[in-house]
Structure formats: structure tokens, C-alpha cells
Amino acid sequence: MTEYRKPTPAEIEALTAAGNSAENWDAIEVAQNFTPAQLSGCRLEGRVQIGRGARLRRCTIRNYRIGEEALIEGVTALECRRESSFGNGVRVAAINENGGRTVRIYDRLTAQTAYILAVYRYRPEAVEAIERMIERYAAERRDTLGTVGPHARITGARFIREVNIGKGATIDGASLLENGTVCAGAYVGIDVQARDFIAAEGARIDGGTLLERCFAGECCTLDKH
């Protein structure tokens, strides 16, 4: 487990000289082997943890944990403004769009579980038991800090708010991501806008796709073109 420390006065001086600033340097934590060269032209607000080897360039970050070897470059705002479950527990209309058969999404949802929740309405006890489990899971995921996983890459994006980003995930040029989870290995591309969503492992969302209250399943591709 990574051990964190406060940046030293000499490191803060070097960071400031490289165009970085912080709302409160006392709220910033860095890995033991941190070097100021990891940051350039960044604004840090609230509480920020910076993992080993993470590189931050020309971005604003608020209330996030940045995993080791992650890259964040050219991001207008990566921020967690409030406590969030990061898309876990959101109700999504299934089968019809009138909301009569909603499914609570979460980042471990399977097709089998979703089918039971949407179709087995004649088994209310089973459905209620699964929904209670999902509610507990969503409560466990609640946090005031967002997470960028190890080796994740976020480049050229605009606004990312209350979104957890998994190990090795890539976000390249997304316009707006809000209240969601991008799981390990998933890809979110140019001009994508998504709210209240989960992108499962290996999912690919690209081409200006618009998502709202949606679960993009494992290795699924969503593209306007």
C-alpha cells in the first residue's frame, strides 16, 4: 500500500516555479518518492493524493486520488464536488422507457442480475433482496474523493465530475462525464457526454456519444458513427 506524505517546502517552491498552485498545500499528499517534475501547470484544490510516478500536466484537480503512473494532461476540471457513489445505485429504465421496470446499476452488474431485476417482477422477494444488496454496495462506494486508477490516461478532456476511473482506463477528449464509473480498461473518447452511468471493463464509448442513466456492458462499443 502506498504511503503518502506532505510535500516539503523545497518541493512546493519547485512546484510553484513550474506553474503549479494549490488552494492549500497542507491538503496535498504525495508518494514517498515524489518529485516536482511530475507536475506542470496544474491547479490543485481540496484534498489531492498523487501516486508514485503519476504525471499531471495543465489540469485542475479537486478532491481526487491519483494512482501510480497515471497520466492527466490538458483537463479543464477533474473534480469531486460532493460525496458520491459514482453512478452506483442509479436507476435505469429497462424493457420500456416509462420507468416501470427499473434496474439499479453498479460497477459489478452482470447481464444475469439485470435480467432478474427487470423480468422477475413476479418474484418480489428475490428482486428486493438483490436491490438491498445493490443499495449496500452503493453506500460502501460513497466517498468525498474520486479515484483515478493506476496507469489510467486522461487527456484533452473538459469536465469530469464525480467519476471514478479504473486501472488502465483511457479518457481522450471527452466533453462531460458526471456521476459515473469508468471501469478498468474502458475507453471514453472524443466529445462524449455521459451522466449517471457505468462503463464496464473494456467498454468503448466514442464518436460524440451521449449517455444518460446508462450501463455500457463489458467490451460493448457505443459510437455515433
Language-model segments: residues:
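Domain-scale signature associated with acetyltransferase and cell-envelope carbohydrate enzymes
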Residues: M1-H225
